[in-house]
């Protein structure tokens, strides 16, 4: 079948930069989905995104839907004709619905009899007649939280739409999208190239847009250009550019034709902690900082302009002029903050509520101080340092710098603590208390910092659950899911010997009579353990493996993790499926047992199969106990996997629920002991 390339470009006003890539990829995915639903064959869908446009290009799109052969079965021949051989009303009605006469119907013979049948070929629709509807639906399905109207139009979109370009090969697809008639016109750069021009063919996009309109429509091309040029510019200055993926994509979304330039600021600003300078450069100005080979900030930065004059000096001067007041503010705040010690800011924490029912930030720091000390004692950290860091943990929130540059909380506490002469472990803990801040973030380095980070997060979890405000649906205003996962990561990855039930109980006690939820400890522990599921699923671990461990509810996260790893390994063994099925059978038998179950008595065994299993179970009971104590659950399950043959032989040749009570009790005891061996690791019966 003949194919053509299809272009759809939606020309808009400036789109939200942080949402641009998501909108573009969703547009392409939706178009692909609509094409598939329409039965239109194509090779691939490419997407393009720039500040004032979203576009897709469908390569190798068929010019029509394929023809379909349909078969509509009618009544049985025996019911289609009367005794005289005339068509019945049922047959005539069916034929009329097919647009034929009964005489034109074909016959279909099956093993159940002969039937009337109508076979026809339905020609597919032309692609050009379907494209407007496909694009309309694809745009309607975009993830746009807030839409807007413009002019006197009733249509709504993320930003006002000015042009719609729909080309199927060289043909213009006429129609209306979002209240705008389609055409061949595309708009160029606001200041460079041609303001607007026409395309003769879909294949001219995006190259002609770059040549005549000075717009690089390919998002990934712009991104790669910015990244490569920024690195070159930084190297020329003897440094390395700090280019985070999120900021790189935001900057890519802000420019149509990137021009990467460098500028500088006064060296005196380097006396201010680098984090504060970087915060304003990245967050406010969308600049890329430059560091030397030792990781020290250089007095230079990289920015990306959307215009490309022959002499860029005025643009460079303008950016230097814009950033100078922000850096001056940071310098002033820093110098002012140094005049007062962190500890002297404690009284001001009494004026700030953490949560109305849970008290002030000063109340919270007192709880963190106490809980950090408890945790430190259990993990081998310095209690005095942990408590000191807990006491000072929120003091930097009262500084000018953090008030103005909120994302510097923690790191400014570290710098101020160093200036105050606090111990280095204490200072570092003030910064690392917030780690991990996001998925994949680094963890606190020292055990002192781990103590404070855990204390802070568990205090928040316990307090909010304690007043009955656990997360509902997607709402999570206190970021409790992130806090819970952060605790699990710290405990598991640092292999800390902490029991959640114990720590949460201690945290609960520190609230005094403020908490109203009597089940707070169990609810917090269950909530935290529940976070394991998302973590392990992201690693590709099967859900039933996680559920098998959750069924046992081990409350030590490091122990929980060891069990999951062991069961995940066990699941790969040849005997795993049979043993899981056997455990299900054992569970069902024991659940129906109506007599007391004692210990195994080898002397009561009658059948060789039951004696063999009993001996194997008793032998393994002794062998696995040291391994259980060591937490070597993989070795435990490897040993238990050897029970497959004696278990199979037992169920093949032994009846458990016999009339003779002593024999029945002993056989139930064998199964109970067997079950308990597995349950010391996980509930294997849950495995699918």
From Swiss-Prot:
Listed InterPro entries: DALR_anticod-bd, Gly-tRNA-synth_bsu, Gly-tRNA-synth_heterodimer
Domain of life: Bacteria
Any single GO BP term: glycyl-tRNA aminoacylation
GO CC annotations on file: cytosol
EC class name: ligase
Compartments (UniProt record): Cytoplasm
EC number(s) recorded for this UniProt protein: 6.1.1.14
GO molecular function, one term: glycine-tRNA ligase activity
Keywords in alphabetical order: Aminoacyl-tRNA synthetase, ATP-binding, Cytoplasm, Ligase, Nucleotide-binding, Protein biosynthesis
Reactions that this protein is recorded to catalyse: tRNA(Gly) + glycine + ATP = glycyl-tRNA(Gly) + AMP + diphosphate
Alphabetized HAMAP family for the sequence: Gly_tRNA_synth_beta
Stated family: Belongs to the class-II aminoacyl-tRNA synthetase family.
Subunit structure: Tetramer of two alpha and two beta subunits.
Official protein name in the record: Glycine--tRNA ligase beta subunit
Species: Histophilus somni (strain 129Pt)
Gene designation per UniProt: glyS
